[in-house]
């Protein structure tokens, strides 16, 4: 379950990767008339083709930056959060914009999908909402109807509002709600399903059981015992905890600032802020690198114009989701907005 990425393993996979790059479309520009070249990334059974212009919007349309997450519902619709009053974009699998939801929450940073009592639910982290509603968890239906809100608990002992700067949310097997204070003190807070505070665990640091930006949370069901997976971004690693908050292990190290994780069977795809996405097997060994950007100056560079980023690479992979067909969706941290669909292919 535990692995450390060494230089030899990294170079081996990187050397096997296939990558063809070209200029990237800007969100909002119309699709070009000439056919796009076939652009691929990854290796072996994890080879992907970049879907040209996926999610492109009508000319002149601006939806704002992408500093958030991606999710799908049972019907296969794709939800992409933005940094604007447009809220969350809803696409079909082919990249056609169907509608937008959650307009009152212009900065949704995380989206966790769940089915509860026959209903499809999103647990979201909102960093900016109405003038009086910032940094809160909002549970909503997939049409944006709000069901529940959680704000900073009094038990946290915060002295100023700025200490509560949450980044991610998931629910545990018993319905408990876990919220990561990733941009704050890196603690992870546990609430019951009604939203009552129960406990917190971890604190800022680099040792076992500590985090330096608990940026992303996921429920890892690849093993006999489900575990809480934490993207410990500024420690460049993924860590496991049980749902009582007990540290289990650091499972993968030397990633490039992991932001979010999504699962497909025994495999996990990790978005990395330093220009890459990585696929890990059940032993948490990398089996493919996707969109690996060789230009370090573009890593974690929010201010880039999408036209400056080669189509088949990422600049700051932030949101990611892998669907039932193992297709992958990635949103870069980008001030204009950049979404990429990678379609799994065969070689």
Which residues does each predicted region cover?
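Blade-level signature of beta-propeller repeat domains, shared across WD40, Kelch, NHL, RCC1
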Residues: 316-347
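Surface-exposed loop and turn segments in beta-propeller and other repeat-based domains
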Residues: 52-61, 147-160, 164, 198-209, ...
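Blade/loop signatures of beta-propeller domains
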Residues: 31-52
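N-terminal secretory signal peptides and thylakoid transit peptides that target proteins
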Residues: 1-18
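Beta-rich, blade/repeat-based domains predominating
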Residues: 62-74, 105-118, 155-176, 206-227, ...
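Beta-strand-rich domains and repeat architectures in extracellular enzymes and scaffolds
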Residues: 52-83
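Conserved beta-propeller blade signature
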Residues: 77-79, 121-123, 177-178, 227-229, ...
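Blade-loop segments of beta-propeller domains
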Residues: 87, 93-119, 126-127
């Amino acid at each position: 379950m535990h692995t450390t990425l060494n230089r030899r393993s990294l170079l081996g996979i990187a050397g096997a990767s296939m990558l063809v790059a070209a200029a990237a479309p800007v969100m909002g520009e119309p699709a070009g008339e000439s056919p796009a070249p076939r652009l691929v990334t990854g290796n072996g059974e994890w080879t992907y083709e970049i879907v040209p212009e996926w999610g492109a919007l009508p000319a002149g349309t601006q939806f704002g930056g992408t500093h958030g997450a991606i999710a799908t519902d049972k019907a296969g619709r794709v939800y992409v959060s933005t940094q604007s009053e447009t809220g969350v974009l809803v696409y079909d699998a082919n990249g056609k914009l169907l509608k937008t939801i959650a307009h009152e929450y212009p900065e949704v940073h995380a989206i966790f999908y769940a089915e509860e009592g026959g209903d499809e639910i999103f647990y979201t982290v909102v960093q900016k909402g109405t003038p009086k509603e910032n940094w809160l968890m909002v549970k909503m239906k997939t049409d944006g109807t709000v069901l529940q809100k959680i704000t900073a608990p009094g038990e946290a002992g915060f002295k100023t509002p700025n200490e509560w700067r949450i980044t991610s949310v998931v629910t545990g097997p018993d319905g408990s709600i876990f919220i990561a204070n990733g941009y704050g003190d890196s603690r992870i807070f546990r609430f019951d399903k009604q939203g009552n505070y129960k406990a917190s665990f971890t604190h800022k640091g680099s040792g076992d059981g500590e985090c330096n930006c608990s940026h992303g949370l996921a429920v890892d069901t690849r093993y006999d015992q489900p575990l809480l997976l934490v993207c410990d971004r500024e420690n460049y690693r993924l860590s496991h905890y049980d749902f009582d908050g007990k540290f289990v292990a650091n499972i993968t190290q030397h990633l490039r600032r992991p932001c979010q994780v999504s699962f497909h069977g025994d495999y996990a795809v990790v978005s990395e802020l330093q220009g890459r996405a990585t696929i890990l097997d059940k032993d948490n060994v990398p089996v493919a690198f996707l969109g690996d950007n060789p230009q370090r100056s573009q890593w974690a560079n929010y201010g880039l114009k999408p036209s400056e980023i080669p189509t088949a690479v990422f600049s700051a992979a932030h949101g990611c989701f892998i669907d039932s067909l193992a297709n992958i969706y990635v949103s870069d941290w980008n001030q204009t907005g950049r979404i990429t669909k990678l379609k799994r292919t065969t070689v």
